[in-house]
Curated annotation (Swiss-Prot):
Name of the protein this chain belongs to: UDP-N-acetylmuramoylalanine--D-glutamate ligase
Pfam families, per the entry: Mur_ligase_C (PF02875), Mur_ligase_M (PF08245), MurD-like_N (PF21799)
NCBIfam families assigned to the protein according to its UniProt record, in alphabetical order: murD (TIGR01087)
Annotated function: Cell wall formation. Catalyzes the addition of glutamate to the nucleotide precursor UDP-N-acetylmuramoyl-L-alanine (UMA).
Location of this chain's protein in the cell: Cytoplasm
A single Gene Ontology CC term: cytoplasm
Major place of residence: cytoplasm
Organism of derivation: Chlamydia trachomatis serovar D (strain ATCC VR-885 / DSM 19411 / UW-3/Cx)
Length: 416
């Protein structure tokens, strides 16, 4: 690569992957993290810095972990010194490997992971080797070594640094966009531009499918609606939430741009696919009260979508850490689907203010929220955890929050 001293900011899962990749290239890796433990447990770095130390000299470029803000003092120091800053996807896209075979990428506000995992499943079930990577769990610099079609989930955090064109993707899709991560990007315009930057990664920009006419690319709505009508005709299929059908059809559209996968194969894949947990996950019922774990709903728009599928007797648990959104836009969906809201966590009072026209009870944490919801519930009601917030006020991840909810729900007796 010709560059010798590279700073890696943030040494979590992605940061360790970045450091490992660079070390294999013979680069001198300078690691920075707020945690001394993280620095001591990363064997790929030659120089270790806590983030409150001064930015080092003679740095060729900086690679930040996806969760590291562009406002991080070391990122700002690099920008002030005209040192290039990038994320792991830019590092990956500069390698020759990404032009060797088909590589697809998906971004959007909601539905990315389900769409990515279904696309991988559809390919494999059709006899086509494929591997999902990126924001879906396996860092891109690790996953790109695997054979088959690359299917990359990309977040706005990773696309925020995309200033140059790296035309490596044979297909791509921007599923949708609504207010999200405004605490990170500063405003909707910056968030929108980060998503649009996916176009800079296309081998042919005309091969980018988009779900919003504000984006540059081919609008996919007509094609997706055609495949949704196809699924609606299949009475043998298990009941599907509308947003799940939508995601599956988006995946099929992207798959068909690369390979001639039949409609029969698509329908069979839909019938046998197991959706990842914490996404409108039905847990069962006890004493006539139903429970749904939708901990992955970390945005207002995701919770709005969830409310479309819960009937009209829901008690909704909201709250956590706000990502820069207002909650008042939930009111129309709540009026149709819910009887009350239980607000918890860091922004509980903010939720209560935004939803002052609706019955809201404020509690401290998830345990109290579930107890409060159960006190209000009668047989036939649905208690749904769909927080519309990040989990980081009280949990390490939405997965941990969802697992706690499942544990709390199942504590008294086995669900039917």
């Amino acid at each position: 690569m010709g560059l010798e001293r590279v700073v890696v900011i943030g040494l979590g899962v992605s940061g360790r992957s970045i450091a490992h990749f660079l070390a294999q290239k013979g680069v001198c890796v300078l690691g920075v993290d707020k945690s001394l433990h993280a620095l001591q447990n990363c064997p790929y770095i030659q120089e270790k810095y806590l983030e409150n130390e001064e930015f080092p000299s003679q740095v060729d470029y900086v690679v930040r972990s996806p969760g590291v803000s562009k406002e991080h003092p070391w990122v700002q120091a690099a920008i002030a010194s005209h040192i290039p800053v990038m994320a792991d996807i830019q590092l990956a896209f500069q390698t020759e490997k990404f032009t060797e075979r088909e590589s697809l990428a998906i971004t959007g506000t909601t539905g990315k992971t389900t769409t990515i995992l279904f696309l991988e499943y559809l390919f494999k079930r059709s006899g086509i080797p494929a591997f999902a990577m990126g924001n879906v769990g396996i860092p891109i610099l690790d996953g790109m070594q695997n054979p088959g079609v690359r299917i990359v989930e990309i977040s706005s955090f990773q696309l925020a640094d995309q200033e140059k064109s790296y035309p490596v993707l044979s297909g791509g899709m921007i599923l949708n966009i609504s207010d999200n991560h405004l605490d990170y990007h500063g405003n909707f315009s910056e968030y929108f531009q980060a998503k649009q930057n996916l176009a800079l990664c296309m081998r042919n920009p005309d091969d980018l499918w988009v779900g919003d006419e504000r984006f540059y690319g081919h609008l996919y709505l007509e094609e997706v609606q055609k495949y949704m009508r196809l699924l609606d005709k299949e009475s043998a299929l298990k009941p599907l939430y509308l947003h799940d059908k939508y995601n599956y059809c988006c995946a099929y559209l992207l798959a068909k741009t690369e390979f001639p996968i039949s409609e029969t194969s698509f329908i069979e894949a839909v019938a046998t696919f197991n959706k990842p947990p914490h996404r409108m996950e039905y847990l069962g019922q006890k004493q006539g009260i139903h429970y749904i774990n939708d901990s992955k709903a970390t945005t207002v728009s995701a919770t709005e979508t969830a409310l479309l599928g819960v009937g009209n007797q829901a008690i909704v648990i909201l709250g956590g850490r706000n990502k820069g959104c207002t909650f008042s836009s939930l009111l129309p969906a709540l009026r149709k689907a819910a009887k009350s809201v239980v607000a918890m966590g860091e922004c509980a009072q903010e939720i209560a203010r935004d939803l002052e026209e609706f019955p809201v009870t404020v509690v401290k944490n998830l345990s109290e929220a579930l107890l409060c919801a159960e006190e209000q519930a009668v047989p036939g009601d649905v208690i749904v955890l769909s927080p519309a917030c990040a989990s980081f006020d009280q949990f390490r991840s939405y997965e941990e929050r969802g697992a706690m909810f499942k544990q709390l729900v199942g504590m008294e007796e086995v669900l039917l």
